[in-house]
Amino acid sequence: MLKIGEFSKLSRLSIRQLRDLDEAGLLAPASIDAFTGYRYYSENQLPIANRIRALKEMGFTQPVIGVVLPLYGDRTAIERCLTLRRAEARMELEAAQRRLR
């Protein structure tokens, strides 16, 4: 088991992000010490943390990540989500360019 700080370094998600993800029900600690309140994560949770970090880096919001994460085994569904995110990003870019003119 890894303390939250150790898991944070390995997953490249901040401690604050890990706490937020726990509150959102996206990545709960494997266990929490009842006496100290310390959060412990399993190495088996690293792939999920990496998926979450990748989705965040692509601009997905936390609520959308909650919808996309369970679809990770379905390649077609993930491709659709990525296509939609790409279209969103394109629209955001075009709106920003219009504001600059």
Please annotate each region the language model reported.
Residues 1-63:
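Basic helix-turn-helix/winged-helix DNA-binding cores
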Residues 53, 70-101:
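Short, charged amphipathic alpha-helical surface segments
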